[in-house]
């Protein structure tokens, strides 16, 4: 693997940090820093016209990808991770073994900023599960730029007649161990009159400000979609942005094609919590698709397009935005 430890790390103008394998497992990449800037100047402004920086752990065929992590020293969060026109990638291409451990991506920092065509991707093709992406932050800001929109994706692309893998979990939240935990009690949906007895602990970030950003956890090819979770006790703003989860040709409560149980019973979900939730020119979408309407495997599985939960403590605002839960080819909406 590759490990970088320094107070300040600057990656500029097409620099690459790579580990890869063919029919083997790629190594891990870790950064332990106070501040990491990638194609960002000392003044915090993205560099204009800079070639993309790539940080990637990838494999092809039999093996799995490694993981990529950004954090501070000695278990502390970093002060800042600032990325412009930067590609962070863990991926398995043409996976032969659908049970390989996926490559995950984690950022733990007080401030994370993703700008100008930055992509954070834990995608797979060929049947392996996609990796998880976890951003543990106090504040998260994203902004599109001349080099494109910001992308955060954990997709499983398999195609027709392929043993599909599950799309991954994408979690945007506070910093466990540093952000005070918040535990809430819930009733089970099947027993609405019972006393709340299910405890769930959250870590809330201070603020999310997402602009020109696409977040998706989509499965293509006989596989369940993933889950996108956002947790803040401040404002969650999505401006000119989209969030999607997609399940294709998968029966809820079934095993995945590789025989392993699906996470969350195969239900995909978008779950956003905040004091205020603001959508402007944005789309929130949960999809289910059946490619072969003759067999229609999803028809027997109950709601299969997943769920959309928008939980605002104070206010919810949607301006020229779409919230959609859809089923295609006889698939059922959630």
What are these regions (language model features)?
Residues 1-334:
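Extracellular and secretory-pathway beta-repeat/beta-biased strand scaffolds
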């Amino acid at each position: 693997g590759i490990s970088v430890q320094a107070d300040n790390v600057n990656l500029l103008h097409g620099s690459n940090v790579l580990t890869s394998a063919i029919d083997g497992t790629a190594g891990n990449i870790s950064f332990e820093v106070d501040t990491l800037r990638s194609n960002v100047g000392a003044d915090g402004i993205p560099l204009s016209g800079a070639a993309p920086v790539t940080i990637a752990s990838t494999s092809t065929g039999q093996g799995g990808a490694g993981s990529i992590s950004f954090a501070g020293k000695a278990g502390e969060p970093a002060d800042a991770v600032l990325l412009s026109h930067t590609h962070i990638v863990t991926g398995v291409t043409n996976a032969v073994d659908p049970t390989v451990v996926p490559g995950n991506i984690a950022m733990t920092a007080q401030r994370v900023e993703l700008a100008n065509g930055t992509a954070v991707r834990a995608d797979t093709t060929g049947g392996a599960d996609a990796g998880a992406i976890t951003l543990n932050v106090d504040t998260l800001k994203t902004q599109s730029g001349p080099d494109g929109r910001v992308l955060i994706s954990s997709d499983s692309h398999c195609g027709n007649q392929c043993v599909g893998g599950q799309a991954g979990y994408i979690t945007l939240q506070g910093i466990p161990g540093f952000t005070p935990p918040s535990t809430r009690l819930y009733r089970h949906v099947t027993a609405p009159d019972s006393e709340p007895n299910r405890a769930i602990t959250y870590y809330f970030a201070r603020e999310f400000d997402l602009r020109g950003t696409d977040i998706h956890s989509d499965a293509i090819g006989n596989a369940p979609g993933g889950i996108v979770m956002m947790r803040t006790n401040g404002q969650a703003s999505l401006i000119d942005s989209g969030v999607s989860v997609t399940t294709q040709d998968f029966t809820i409560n079934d095993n995945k094609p590789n025989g392993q149980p699906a996470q969350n019973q195969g239900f995909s979900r978008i779950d956003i919590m905040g004091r205020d939730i603001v959508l402007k020119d944005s789309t929130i979408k949960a999809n289910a698709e059946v490619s072969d309407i003759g067999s229609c495997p999803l028809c027997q599985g109950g709601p299969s397009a997943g769920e959309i939960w928008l939980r605002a403590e104070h206010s919810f605002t949607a301006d020229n935005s779409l919230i959609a839960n859809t089923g295609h080819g006889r698939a059922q909406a959630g």
